[in-house]
């Protein structure tokens, strides 16, 4: 639970259906409570409140129910590309056209096309030079850095970058 992890909480948003009454009483920040039966997920409600920030970090958004994990990934892929999903073992972010730097915080690094694109990787075990990656391909699964930092260049399209420390 985020409430036990010591993160500073500025606002709590959602239906709180998975939170015990005891834990709910521990929330000391402003609360925006929504009905359980609604058209949005709790994550979507929270992201909408923060949509103007450059980067939004969603902690714990990949734990628990797989349907909610997939929904959170899809929110990052298609609606709010400034969202980074992160937990103690992995991080998922969107890389659009441009040059991006990745450090060696994570051992396994994969790239999945959100739309067909062109990808270059340097400083990686499996480098690429302007490789066209089609939407159905998994060719760029499980790479790793050979240096302290790797350079990712997206010339076309956009990619989901999955970084993990799982074995």
What residues fall within each predicted segment?
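Acidic/Gly/His-enriched mid-domain segments of enzyme catalytic cores or analogous surface patches
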Residues: 1-81
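Residues that form or immediately flank small-molecule/cofactor binding pockets and catalytic motifs
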Residues: 36, 88-90, 116
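A short acidic, often aromatic-flanked loop/helix-cap motif at beta-alpha or helix-coil junctions
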Residues: 37-41, 91-93, 134
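N-terminal start-of-chain detector that recognizes signal peptides
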Residues: 55-57, 82-85, 91, 122-126, ...
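Short beta-strand segments
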Residues: 59-61, 86, 112
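Class I SAM-dependent methyltransferase SAM-binding "motif I" and its flanking Rossmann-like core
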Residues: 72-73, 77-104
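Long, charged alpha-helical interface segments
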Residues: 95-167
């Amino acid at each position: 639970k985020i409430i036990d992890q010591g993160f500073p909480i500025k606002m709590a948003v959602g239906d709180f259906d998975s939170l015990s009454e005891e834990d709910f009483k521990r929330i000391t920040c402003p609360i925006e409570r929504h009905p359980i039966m609604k058209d949005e997920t709790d994550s979507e409600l929270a992201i909408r409140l923060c949509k103007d920030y450059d980067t939004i970090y969603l902690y714990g958004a990949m734990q628990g129910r797989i349907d909610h994990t997939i929904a959170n990934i899809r929110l990052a892929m298609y609606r709010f590309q400034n969202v980074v999903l992160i937990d103690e073992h992995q991080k998922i972010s969107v890389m659009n056209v441009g040059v991006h730097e990745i450090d060696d915080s994570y051992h396994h690094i994969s790239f999945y096309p959100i739309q067909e694109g062109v990808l270059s990787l340097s400083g990686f075990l499996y480098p690429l030079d302007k490789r066209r990656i089609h939407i159905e391909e998994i060719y760029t699964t499980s790479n790793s850095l050979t240096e302290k930092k790797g350079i990712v260049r997206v010339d076309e399209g956009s990619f989901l970058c999955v970084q993990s420390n799982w074995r």
